[in-house]
Amino acid sequence: MEKNCGSGQSKLKALRMHIYFEVDFQEQAQHYQAVLHSRGVTVDLQPIEKLNARFLRLNPDLALCVDENGLWLSANGMKMQPDWKAEIPRLKRASLKSEMIARACQLGEKPVLVDATAGLGHDSLLMAYLGAQIQLVERHPILFTLLEDSKAQAQRDPFLSQFMDRIQLIFADSASYLKQLDQEEKTVDVVYLDPMFPQRDQNQQAIKKQAQVKKQMQLLHLLLPEDGEMDLGGHLLELAKKVAKRVIVKRPRHAIFLANQEPAHQWQGDACRFDAYFQ
């Protein structure tokens, strides 16, 4: 069951988006149009003859498209979706012992965990597979709808469907959601933060150049511009510490501490690290 806290789109500007689709997928396109409209997005339906690579190259503006694999975000000749099914090989290799994130979040204890920076949901997918009960919070209506579509597809997959009931999608602003938990005197075991735009290191060198970011993230950055409505996640740290026994922050290995707050403990990997803050 998905939850709508009513604040998902409150701080976002009015959104308008095209949905491109071939005639065979008109019904699905109309469904997505209705869902997005209910979340404050104006959607223009654009039936086209052939949704292929050539069409995407000739229509580089940010848009949505629908095909036999569901809803996609497209721009600059590329298209992407969270695609949880593509994560299955990674999940099958994963274990509580092999995954650093499992040690950081104590997944062996099957925690109740709020992922306050949803992104594409891949880390939450892994954590749910390893036993956590996930509250996946996302405020952007288009990204939330993409996540919702990925979960719906996962529920029809023999492997993924085994643990989809451990993931609850929540359409809300993360700060508002954490404040609500605090006001209601509710606590969770873990709050997980993975800011999409990590702060730069002390030398002001970008952690990753845009050209090196994989396709999915390139398109996500177009949808959620760093200098627009999205932030670096620092303000979430204090809110998270009020409602969780343990706050885990994923960072590029050489990034500065989130909100310049030194963690109580760290787990270091080759490319990233996990900073822990305890209540």
Curated annotation (Swiss-Prot):
Main EC class the enzyme belongs to: transferase
Domain of life: Bacteria
Cytoplasm is among the record's keywords: yes
UniProt GO molecular function: rRNA (guanine-N2-)-methyltransferase activity
Known catalytic reactions: guanosine(1516) in 16S rRNA + S-adenosyl-L-methionine = N(2)-methylguanosine(1516) in 16S rRNA + S-adenosyl-L-homocysteine + H(+)
Residues bound to S-adenosyl-L-methionine: E138, R139, D194
Keywords on record: Cytoplasm, Methyltransferase, rRNA processing, S-adenosyl-L-methionine, Transferase
Cytoplasm keyword on record: yes
Gene3D superfamilies: Vaccinia Virus protein VP39
Compartments it resides in: Cytoplasm
Pfam families, per database record: SAM_MT
Cellular component per GO, a single term: cytoplasm
Protein task: Specifically methylates the guanosine in position 1516 of 16S rRNA.
Record-stated family: Belongs to the methyltransferase superfamily. RsmJ family.
Protein name per Swiss-Prot or TrEMBL: Ribosomal RNA small subunit methyltransferase J
The organism of origin for this protein: Acinetobacter baumannii (strain SDF)
